[in-house]
Amino acid sequence: MPSLVGSEMCIRDSLYTVSAVLTAKEKELDRAEKRVGLRTIELNRERDPYGMNFQFRLNGVPLFIKGSNLIPPDSFITRFDDKKLEALLDAAQFANLNMLRVWGGGYYASDAFYDACDRRGLLVWQDFGFACQAYPFFLPEFLENVKTEVHAQVQRLCHHPSLAVWCGNNEIEDMHMAWVHMQKYVQWTEKFFYEILEPEIRVEDPDTPYTPGSPVGIAHNEGVYSDNVGDTHLWGVWHGLQPMQYYRKRMTRFCSEFGFESLPDAKAIRQYAKPGDYALNSPVFNLHQKCASGNDKMVYYIASRFHLPRRFWDYIYLSQVTQDTCIADATEHWRRHKGQCNGAMYWQFNDCWGVCSWSSLDYYGNYKALQYGARRFNAPLSVSVEDSKERFDVYVLNDLNARQTVTVEYELFDFVTGTLEKEKKKLLLPPVENAVAFSREMAPLRKKYDLRRTGLAVRLVQNGACLQQKTVLFDQEKRLQLPGAKLHTKVEIQKDQLCLTVTTDRFARLVHLESSRTSLPFSDNYFDLLPGQSHTVTLAADPDCTLRELAESIRVKSLSDVPFDRDPLHAAAKRIKVYLSPVNIGNAIHHGKLSKDIEL
């Protein structure tokens, strides 16, 4: 009996080789082979109590999509070889992604890409090559050329079990408001994506789901900005300068784009900048930033949470942890409301050159904080906290199609002395269902403890092993009494890796390990340690240096090692200046508004 292709796991054993041989008079003339997998994939767009669904089902099982948007991995296509492809998809698996969106503003990926996604169980959202502008579909020659392209790509890719959906375009409907004097383009955009394209696809591929564009509503230009139908691109945070908690106000059915910029790794910056360029608004840094006011926006958001750092290099660290916090908060919010929301695909996964951007993986292969964070917040079995000024609720999130028995521990701790109170509970989770383990009111805690020096730690334990620890603080770091933490790192050289055990005396916020000798990832990074706690991290050997050299290159720090400018007026002045720039005011008006649900 053939095995069905699944997700959340490697599917190598579920792939089969199909061969076709052309013969004449018992002589072989030609042969073709393809690797295929058996599965059903559906995109459920039916009405439900929340509006109109946008939910993928794999073999009949609802999926919460944890994905990212893939841009061209290099500005020069031929520089992207098979080794880089494997590293790229290794990073996607490390981040616990189950879908990559091949963005329509780039180019169609190679056969090797789709083969590798098939092997890894990574689903692919495939945009056609139309994005962000008007196309002259009304010209017969152009339309016939487009149809030829569509048939060629569909025929090439439709056998891949990783292919989950054909998407007509990226954000073209979103651009229509600027096409006042281009009504012919508007009319033909609707005609092509809503009437012409899908029948052309069905000639080659009768089964794979199709959606006219992203974002999409219920019809052309109907509900494109609505949360209760279709998929959404949410840019209230970042472009709209909304606070990072803004996403908790949005109960979208499926968020296929949302993002936040950060600086790349220091090793990446040294590839394109010299010491005299190390300033966020230097000519070189402005050149390597393609978002208007992007570097200033990073400062704007860093200052909302931290004091501003005195050293340039600490902007890398703080921009990356701020990016991770933003994407994690949104993804966990939507995962907690699985069923109403069915997917979170952050923008963007990778870079095509050395740049400050929305990516979790920089051009040179260095993992940003978001890569490590995604491994945690996208884990198929994970813990999440929904917190407010009034209460907090501890959730266990289960995306696995099997019952899970887990123990959830919650601990209130003092930043210096450690445990204040602790409780644990055993839970039996049904397949692909979430559960609330604890709910607590904040008022009694405020009376009992000084919350400026108190944190909440939640642990998820299964079969005696701690799968995950999550820390929640009750205010922004700049308002808390975070102590100076002394970190001790023990480095052990093993056969093919380093083992690093980090221990702290007091609460250590956002412990960061880095190496100047390798871009290979640590097994974990940017984590918190409670007073007296230790955590062991591994780093694989790099063929370009010895393990001894690698060990000597390791540097460890936490938030308490960052020297800050603690002048609140300085930070406030910077935030006001960023907000009042004309481009940011316009974006704030456009992107900051809450959606209005469309009536069905």
Over which residues does each language-model region extend?
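Terminal connector regions
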Residues: R12-L15, A20-A32, S439-P483, D542-I598
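Single conserved hydrophobic/aromatic residue that forms the stacking wall/gate
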Residues: M1-G6, I11
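Beta-strand-rich binding/interaction modules
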Residues: M1, F392-L429, N434-S439, T454-V461, ...
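Short strand-edge motifs at loop-to-beta-strand transitions and within beta-strands
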Residues: N434-F438, N525-F527, Q533-V537
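Substrate-binding clefts and catalytic carboxylate motifs of secreted carbohydrate-active enzymes
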Residues: W166, P199-R202, T211-S214, I218-V229, ...
